[in-house]
Amino acid sequence: MIEIPSDFSEQTAKFTQILAKFNRVHSLTNYKNFDEQISDSISPLKWLKFYPETAIDVGSGAGFPAIFLAMILKDCRWWLFEPNAKKSSFLSYVKAELNLKNVSVKSCKIEACEPFVAQLITSRALMKTKELLKICRGFYDNETQILLYKGSSVEGELDGLDAQIYGVKNRNYVFLNVKRDWKENE
């Protein structure tokens, strides 16, 4: 079982202050209740069956879920891919302010980077599942766990995929096991 570190509340309070300040100027997110988003970010950890050493977050935006997962999974090396310059600058600032040494921010689309295999890939409401798998090709292998934060209607996106879905309120947490040689028309 993955435990919440003792400094998590302090870290999330700092994050919330930083995001509120940046959001007034840069409109990084439309979320009003950051505590709900933080809770949503960490909720699927109870179903994660292993402690990853390497993880990728695709389309990291304002840091949900990756920043909070990185706060908890401190021994995991995180790469956050965010092509939007103001959002990636914000993420870099948060990384420095919160001293998140296990986080690297990549200011580019994942498909523009040299592939490397991660043990965990996360993404929150970025795009359709099979499109995400296409752009992440080369970053996963048969052992990689993919965790997607999806809305209430996700089943049609998962045809032909090995998926476990955990539903909470209007959120579906989808854990995928995808073979490295997965093809869209399988």
UniProtKB/Swiss-Prot annotation:
Q: EC number(s) for this protein?
A: 2.1.1.170
Q: What is the purpose of this protein? A: Specifically methylates the N7 position of guanine in position 527 of 16S rRNA.
Question: NCBIfam families this protein is in?
Answer: rsmG_gidB
Which keywords accompany this UniProt record? Cytoplasm, Methyltransferase, rRNA processing, S-adenosyl-L-methionine, Transferase
Location of this chain's protein in the cell: Cytoplasm
Which HAMAP family is this protein grouped with? 16SrRNA_methyltr_G (MF_00074)
Any one GO MF term held by the record is: rRNA (guanine-N7-)-methyltransferase activity
Protein species of origin:
Campylobacter curvus (strain 525.92)
Its main localization is cytoplasm
Pfam families in UniProt: GidB (PF02527)
- In this chain, S-adenosyl-L-methionine is annotated as bound at G59, F64, I110, E111, R124
Question: Gene name?
Answer: rsmG
Would you name any one GO CC term?
Answer: cytosol
**Record family assignment:** Belongs to the methyltransferase superfamily. RNA methyltransferase RsmG family.
Report which residue ranges the record marks as coiled coil.
Answer: none
The protein's annotated catalytic reaction(s) are:
guanosine(527) in 16S rRNA + S-adenosyl-L-methionine = N(7)-methylguanosine(527) in 16S rRNA + S-adenosyl-L-homocysteine
Q: Where is the signal peptide?
A: none
> Which Cys pairs are S-S linked?
none
State what protein this is by name: Ribosomal RNA small subunit methyltransferase G
